[in-house]
C-alpha cells in the first residue's frame, strides 16, 4: 500500500506547549497542535513563538501536524 500524500500548510507558532509541542495558527485561520520533525530535533533547530513554519498534516487527522521547516 502506498503512503498517503501529506498536506502542507504555512503557519505561525502561537504558543509553546510541554513536550516539544506547539500551537500553530495556519494561514486559513485554523489552530492545530504540532510537534517538531525528527531532523529538526537532530539538528537542534529552535522554534519559538512568532516563528513562521511549514506544517505537514495527514488527511485523516486535521487537528495534529508536524513542523518540518522553520522559515528564516
UniProtKB/Swiss-Prot annotation:
<dbReference type="InterPro" id="IPR003029">
    <property type="entry name" value="S1_domain"/>
</dbReference>
<dbReference type="GO" id="GO:0019843">
    <property type="term" value="F:rRNA binding"/>
</dbReference>
<dbReference type="InterPro" id="IPR012340">
    <property type="entry name" value="NA-bd_OB-fold"/>
</dbReference>
<comment type="subunit">
    <text>Component of the 30S ribosomal translation pre-initiation complex which assembles on the 30S ribosome in the order IF-2 and IF-3, IF-1 and N-formylmethionyl-tRNA(fMet); mRNA recruitment can occur at any time during PIC assembly.</text>
</comment>
<dbReference type="GO" id="GO:0043022">
    <property type="term" value="F:ribosome binding"/>
</dbReference>
<keyword id="KW-0963">Cytoplasm</keyword>
<keyword id="KW-0396">Initiation factor</keyword>
<comment type="function">
    <text>One of the essential components for the initiation of protein synthesis. Stabilizes the binding of IF-2 and IF-3 on the 30S subunit to which N-formylmethionyl-tRNA(fMet) subsequently binds. Helps modulate mRNA selection, yielding the 30S pre-initiation complex (PIC). Upon addition of the 50S ribosomal subunit IF-1, IF-2 and IF-3 are released leaving the mature 70S translation initiation complex.</text>
</comment>
<comment type="similarity">
    <text>Belongs to the IF-1 family.</text>
</comment>
<dbReference type="InterPro" id="IPR004368">
    <property type="entry name" value="TIF_IF1"/>
</dbReference>
<protein>
    <recommendedName>
        <fullName>Translation initiation factor IF-1</fullName>
    </recommendedName>
</protein>
<dbReference type="Pfam" id="PF01176">
    <property type="entry name" value="eIF-1a"/>
</dbReference>
<keyword id="KW-0699">rRNA-binding</keyword>
<keyword id="KW-0694">RNA-binding</keyword>
<dbReference type="GO" id="GO:0005829">
    <property type="term" value="C:cytosol"/>
</dbReference>
<keyword id="KW-0648">Protein biosynthesis</keyword>
<feature type="domain" description="S1-like">
    <location>
        <begin position="1"/>
        <end position="72"/>
    </location>
</feature>
<dbReference type="GO" id="GO:0003743">
    <property type="term" value="F:translation initiation factor activity"/>
</dbReference>
<dbReference type="InterPro" id="IPR006196">
    <property type="entry name" value="RNA-binding_domain_S1_IF1"/>
</dbReference>
Amino acid at each position: 500500500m502506498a503512503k498517503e500524500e501529506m498536506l502542507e500548510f504555512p503557519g505561525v507558532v502561537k504558543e509553546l506547549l510541554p513536550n516539544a509541542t506547539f500551537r500553530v495558527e495556519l494561514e486559513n485561520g485554523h489552530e492545530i497542535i504540532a510537534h517538531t520533525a525528527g531532523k529538526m530535533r537532530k539538528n537542534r533547530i529552535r522554534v519559538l513563538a512568532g516563528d513562521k513554519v511549514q506544517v505537514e498534516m495527514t488527511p485523516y487527522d486535521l487537528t495534529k501536524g508536524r513542523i518540518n521547516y522553520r522559515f528564516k
